[in-house]
Amino acid sequence: QLTLALIKPDAVAHPLILEAVHQQILSNKFLIVRMRELLWKPEDCRRFYREHEGRFFYQRLVEFMTSGPIRAYILAHKDAIQLWRTLMGPTRVFRARHIAPDSIRGSLGLTDTRNTTHGSDSVVSASREIAAFFPDFSEQRWYEEEEPQLRCGPVHYSPEEGIHCAAETGGPKPA
């Protein structure tokens, strides 16, 4: 299963926090299918969070998410969506600190907006969100061409590219 994971500006701004989150991804055996860092344009951010438009936190969220670089990942794992959400912990940092203190948000989150990470909440959301950040990525092509190679191994993690690839290919196929 694929999911989108975002590392928010509060974490990207601090190299040690960014590296800690990245290591959590690796140590939990996620395959990093794609990764990119970007400065989010306000109009793209508003479109992404349009379901929250009109809510009290919407403008603050858009301003924060466009305030600095973010890192976007496509992660693969059995039950990737649920596993990533469990690793992140509850959205509300106060709750995360009490219910899941070892989660990413419980240990690194600052506020409910500056809570370090975002993750897709369903298969439908994951597809939509992946397309928003990786418009040239084809899920269908990935499942047909790359996923079987990654599943059957051997798999290599390339620190230079920040992604996993089948050992014999040396990198992802162009989208």
Curated annotation (Swiss-Prot):
InterPro entries: NDK-like_dom, NDK-like_dom_sf, NDPk6, Nucleoside_diP_kinase, Nucleoside_diP_kinase_AS. It holds the Pfam family NDK. It catalyses: a 2'-deoxyribonucleoside 5'-diphosphate + ATP = a 2'-deoxyribonucleoside 5'-triphosphate + ADP; a ribonucleoside 5'-diphosphate + ATP = a ribonucleoside 5'-triphosphate + ADP. One of its GO terms (cellular component) is mitochondrion. It comes from the Eukaryota. GO terms for molecular function: ATP binding; metal ion binding; nucleoside diphosphate kinase activity. Its EC number is 2.7.4.6. Gene3D superfamilies: Nucleoside diphosphate kinase-like domain. Keywords: ATP-binding, Kinase, Magnesium, Metal-binding, Nucleotide metabolism, Nucleotide-binding, Transferase. The active site is at 118 (pros-phosphohistidine intermediate). GO terms for biological process: CTP biosynthetic process; GTP biosynthetic process; negative regulation of cell growth; negative regulation of mitotic nuclear division; UTP biosynthetic process. Belongs to the NDK family. Major role in the synthesis of nucleoside triphosphates other than ATP. The ATP gamma phosphate is transferred to the NDP beta phosphate via a ping-pong mechanism, using a phosphorylated active-site intermediate. This is Nucleoside diphosphate kinase 6.
